[in-house]
Design a protein with these regions (language model features):
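A hydrophobic transmembrane-helix motif
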Residues: 1-23
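Cytosolic ends of transmembrane helices, especially the final helix of ABC transmembrane type-1 domains
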Residues: 17, 23-51
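C-terminal boundary and immediately downstream tail of ABC-type ATPase nucleotide-binding domains
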Residues: 48, 275-287
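Primarily ABC-family ATPase nucleotide-binding module
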Residues: 52-97, 126-129, 232
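The feature captures the beta-strand-to-loop junction immediately N-terminal to the Walker
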Residues: 102-104
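Helix-to-loop junction immediately C-terminal to a conserved catalytic motif
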Residues: 117
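Conserved "ABC signature" C-loop
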Residues: 141-183, 279-282
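ABC-family ATPase nucleotide-binding domain "signature/switch" substructure
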Residues: 148-151, 180-275
């Protein structure tokens, strides 16, 4: 957090390193009992080192702030020794609009967000983004040992009004900003951890907000509240990955992308996709 506040790297970049560090530590705890974890630890450690050493200019993204879009142009991507996830994938996300991405498990939804973040280098094509520091909320987020305030601010300065607004947004107004978060956030529930992470993203997001299954650990009341607040972010570009097809929520999106095995099989508004009675219709009816 101190390095972040001094401008060495962004808060978003810092949290990516924290997430990988926590994964590395978790593997260390079980290494004595499970030798197989050694391979996982080695891979995570190598990836962590690459991320720390990696310069911003080395990200596999073309940043063009005057483009007002996030554009995939004939993108192909896959992991080594595995079948490609995306082949000649093209789509344009316009600045200021809200997009939902749905599809079966393994369809490439989360990978698409990671490509926007520049986590992976693509094999072909190019990705253009208007935002050099998009913010992501993941399905499982990590908090570090410190106060809730410190976890929200990450070394940056925010007014009390901004903090209050973010906490109301994530429905955590009942928590004390000075409450201490223990190691591994053991004194908080999974839902509280996720809502603190959502509040943190609200504080740090300037333009592009990426959401990856962010309500999976929340109860129905908090889910409805936060989904409603996400929709009301009129000054943000939202790309929202979900496996839950909630009619009330998805009706508010400008466009819904339906992925299957890395392919965009259809897209459009909620009503248009239902009326076609194709892939989206069957996802909705069979959930």
């Amino acid at each position: 957090a101190i390095l972040s506040s001094n401008g060495y790297f962004s808060a978003t970049y810092f949290m990516s390193v924290v997430t990988l560090s926590n994964n590395f530590i978790d593997c260390l705890y079980t290494m004595a009992s499970y030798y197989g974890n050694f391979v996982a630890i080695k891979g995570i450690n190598e990836r962590l080192i690459r991320m720390i050493d990696k310069k911003e200019t080395e990200k596999p993204l073309l940043i063009s702030e005057d483009q007002n879009k996030v554009c995939f142009e004939h993108v192909s991507f896959g992991f080594p020794n595995k079948e490609s996830i995306f082949k000649d994938f093209s789509f344009q996300f316009d600045k200021g609009k809200k997009y939902a991405i749905v599809g079966d498990s393994g369809s490439g939804k989360s990978t698409l967000l990671k490509l926007i973040l520049g986590y992976y280098s693509i094999q072909k094509g190019r990705i253009i983004s208007f935002d050099k520091e998009p913010v992501i909320i993941r399905q499982e987020e990590h908090l570090f040992s410190g106060t809730i305030r410190e976890n929200l601010c990450l070394g940056e300065k925010f007014s009390e009004e901004d903090l209050k607004s973010a906490m109301e947004f994530a429905n955590i107004s009942d928590l004390d900003l000075n409450q201490f978060v223990s190691e591994d956030a053991g004194n908080l529930s999974g839902g509280q951890i996720q809502r603190i992470s959502i509040a943190r993203a609200k504080l740090h997001c300037h333009n592009l907000l990426l959401c990856d299954e962010i309500t999976s650990s929340l109860d129905s009341i908090n889910t409805e509240k936060i989904e409603s607040n996400i929709i009301e972010l009129t000054d943000k570009t939202i790309i929202y990955v979900t496996h839950k097809i909630h009619k009330k929520m998805l009706q508010e999106f400008d466009d819904i992308l339906v992925l299957s095995h890395g392919k965009l099989v259809e897209h459009g508004s909620f009503e248009d996709l239902l009326s076609k009675k194709n892939y989206f219709y069957h996802l909705f009816m069979n959930q």
